[in-house]
């Protein structure tokens, strides 16, 4: 059994609260099936176009595969997560929606101290109408570096994060950054390809892993602007 509680606030425009629980069954030590139920409530103190208070009930069926082995500082990782869901959004009317979320990670060891690391994240929401405050948020360390955390929203999004990693010591690696993303927002009728590049480093401490990534995000028809460079900082620890 699992449970979740998530609160997301977009300035003073809206606030979304999501509660849920799920059950899972291990088919093998590396694979499992999941069944999740979530309830989402959105409030909008500031009325705006395409922003409306709603509640949403959603049922998801998920499949996960995960294989991980540790070789020095590198995790040789293969992960696939697929979740499909049906939801009902209630405002003045009731709308039935379909969604799919995919996350895939692949690490390829070239030698004892070099590795290529790839990560894909895909989201698709199909609906007869959309609200800005129900769209998924993207951008940042886990989806598209070089852009602010959760600064992008869309009903269709797919990103590929790529790194070439070099390990000069057992507790440190240096990595390049090249991220590419396709984004489509049916509310604004915008469809763009975004990308970013940069470099980073990760090192082990006594408490966990500290990651620093410096990346510059580029939009269509825009040249390089150093002011668009963002430093992403994360600290991972296991309790």
Residue ranges and their predicted role:
Residues 188-239:
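C-terminal beta-signal and terminal closure region of outer-membrane beta-barrel proteins
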Residues 27, 67, 120, 142, ...:
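A broadly conserved detector of short glycine/acidic/proline-rich loop/turn motifs that flank catalytic sites
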Residues 1-80, 137-140, 151-154, 166, ...:
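Gram-negative/organellar outer-membrane beta-barrel architecture
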Residues 1-2, 29-35, 69-73, 111-116, ...:
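Repeated loop/turn-to-beta-strand initiation elements of outer-membrane beta-barrel proteins
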Residues 56-168, 176-180, 184-185:
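C-terminal outer-membrane beta-barrel translocator/porin domains of Gram-negative envelope proteins
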Residues 6-8, 85-87, 181, 215-217:
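Short strand-loop junctions, especially beta-strand C-caps/beta-turns
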Residues 15, 96, 193:
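Short, glycine/acidic-rich beta->alpha junctions
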Residues 11, 90-93, 184-187, 220-223:
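A generic structural signal for short coil/turn motifs at secondary-structure boundaries
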């Amino acid at each position: 059994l699992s449970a979740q509680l998530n609160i997301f606030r977009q300035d003073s425009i809206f606030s979304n609260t999501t509660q849920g629980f799920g059950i899972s069954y291990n088919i093998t030590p590396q694979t499992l099936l999941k069944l999740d139920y979530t309830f989402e409530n959105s409030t909008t103190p500031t009325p705006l176009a395409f922003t409306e208070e709603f509640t949403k009930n959603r049922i998801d069926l998920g499949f996960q595969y995960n294989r991980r082995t540790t070789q020095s500082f590198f995790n040789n990782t293969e992960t696939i997560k697929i979740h499909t869901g049906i939801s009902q959004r209630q405002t003045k009317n009731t709308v039935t929606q379909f969604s799919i979320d995919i996350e895939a990670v692949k690490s390829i060891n070239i030698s004892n101290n070099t590795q290529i690391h790839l990560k894909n994240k895909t989201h698709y929401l199909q609906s007869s109408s959309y609200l800005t405050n129900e769209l998924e948020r993207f951008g940042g360390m886990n989806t598209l570096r070089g852009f602010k955390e959760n600064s992008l929203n869309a009903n269709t999004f797919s990103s590929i994060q790529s790194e070439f990693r070099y390990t000069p010591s057992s507790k440190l690696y240096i990595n390049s950054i090249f991220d590419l993303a396709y984004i489509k927002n049916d509310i604004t009728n915008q469809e763009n390809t975004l990308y970013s590049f940069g470099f980073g480093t990760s090192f082990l401490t006594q408490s966990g892993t500290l990651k620093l990534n410096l990346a510059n995000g580029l939009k269509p028809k825009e040249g390089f602007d150093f002011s668009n460079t963002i430093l992403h900082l994360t600290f991972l620890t296991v309790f």
